[in-house]
């Protein structure tokens, strides 16, 4: 099973790239984890936000292909680390790749939300999108360490 983090936005600060890469490289070879960046639509005073969301959503769905879609969204379901580990195991048994979708400043398109099989909430707080990348990478790695009995996670 491959996991993709499909996120709107490019040109992240160096600390985001380093933080994401630190956890990405730790993933086991049989569970590759990759970042797919989607260019953000140009936003300005007179920007057509619904159209921008639609275009970003189309690009995200195209990048995901036939993967299981999981949105990262405040109204989604919060998972503990242990529950995320159970989700990882369930996703493995499903046999499909997994695409985690992170929207831009206005969130995800209605099409992405409608196509998703699951929605995961990292927090009821609004988090900066660059930080979400690092949080997701660490959370998934921690959950993976539980499933493989690696000592990274301690209770």
From Swiss-Prot:
Where in the cell is the protein located?
Answer: Cytoplasm
Listed EC numbers: 2.1.1.177
Gene Ontology CC terms, in alphabetical order? cytoplasm
Q: Which InterPro entries match?
A: Alpha/beta_knot_MTases, RlmH-like, tRNA_m1G_MTases_N
Keyword Acyltransferase set for record = no
Q: Which residues bind S-adenosyl-L-methionine?
A: 72, 103, 122-127
Under the GO molecular function aspect, what terms does this record hold?
rRNA (pseudouridine-N3-)-methyltransferase activity
> Superkingdom of this entry's organism?
Bacteria
Task: Write down the chemical reaction(s) this protein catalyses.
Answer: pseudouridine(1915) in 23S rRNA + S-adenosyl-L-methionine = N(3)-methylpseudouridine(1915) in 23S rRNA + S-adenosyl-L-homocysteine + H(+)
Q: Name one Pfam family in it.
A: SPOUT_MTase
Entry keywords, A to Z: Cytoplasm, Methyltransferase, rRNA processing, S-adenosyl-L-methionine, Transferase
**What PANTHER family does the annotation carry?**
METHYLTRANSFERASE (PTHR33603), RIBOSOMAL RNA LARGE SUBUNIT METHYLTRANSFERASE H (PTHR33603:SF1)
Assembly with partners or alone: Homodimer.
Similarity comment: Belongs to the RNA methyltransferase RlmH family.
According to its UniProt entry, the function of this protein is described as: Specifically methylates the pseudouridine at position 1915 (m3Psi1915) in 23S rRNA.
- Protein name, UniProt field: Ribosomal RNA large subunit methyltransferase H
